[in-house]
């Protein structure tokens, strides 16, 4: 697999402010498509400007006001925006793209690049991990014909996919590969083995290391482990990107961990979906932004992405305490049914509901169809 390169423009354009644009077709033309009179936002952060955009084949041929050449197709984008394709920074679309590579739900919203790897990536996989994936969610494949991350993305591309794709290598994925689901510190030998897996993924084109530290078994990795893996990423100019270890009461401490990883590993770092979760902790967000600004003034390359609404979405893995989940899914289920363990679990869950009342939690999906019919839409 070749390393993914981000282009300034995708030749797939999106225009807004009207459900349809006026089009005309010409036979003798200098270009395949000319989009006329739209407000161009070129991705640089500069102000939009009125211009025409001419496309030949799969490349932008020319941008400028009132272009003279005609297009085989002429699109009037007056009053509309012309933009580069959008990047889905945190995509979980790998399995759905295996089933249907057309990606209509994202393409029709203007997304032209899917970036995987928030802690978990499609590779590298062991035989045990493949068996687990087949039992859960692997698209329509009856087998998983890849091992490495590069092989996974090549398999997806060969099946056919409408978007561009890229991936971080998942810190969770390499930990499961080497350590499993045990809640313990990795040994020096295991760190070396994980580093080798990260190096292989970077050689194949991974864009960096992704972590998701509120979930098990990612939560079992200490900061030193993440620094060791990030140092490998730094050798290739990659970034460390993280769903930080806390987004509520320990938000600032969690950010401190990310900044330490960036400093000691010598890499740029990105915060996934920057936010302060739960209303009692919203006030922490201003302090966090100040810390990021200070780090950037000190020369650290730290950035963040954010969504624009005050809600979040996760599954039971983000709600059930990570100590319950140690050992993997079967051990987790057994522990939840243990009459000795259940009182401690209920106490932990009740403590969480003090700051996150249950009426603010909406149930939206179940793997079990009968449970879905009964509970979807309820709080």
Residue ranges and their predicted role:
Residues 2-8:
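Sec-dependent signal peptide recognition
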Residues 15-16:
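C-terminal motif of bacterial Sec signal peptides marking the signal peptidase cleavage site
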Residues 24-32, 40-85, 100:
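Histidine-rich, glycine-flanked metal-binding segment
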Residues 35-36, 60, 271, 363:
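Hydrophobic residues on conserved beta-strands that form the core of alpha/beta folds
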Residues 77-82, 86-87, 91, 97-207, ...:
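Divalent-metal coordination cores built from histidine and acidic residues
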Residues 94-97, 121-124, 214-218, 246-252, ...:
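Active-site environment of divalent metal-dependent phosphoester hydrolases
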Residues 153-156, 161-164, 168-188, 192-215, ...:
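Active-site neighborhoods of metal-dependent hydrolases
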Residues 200-258:
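Divalent metal-binding pocket/active-site signature
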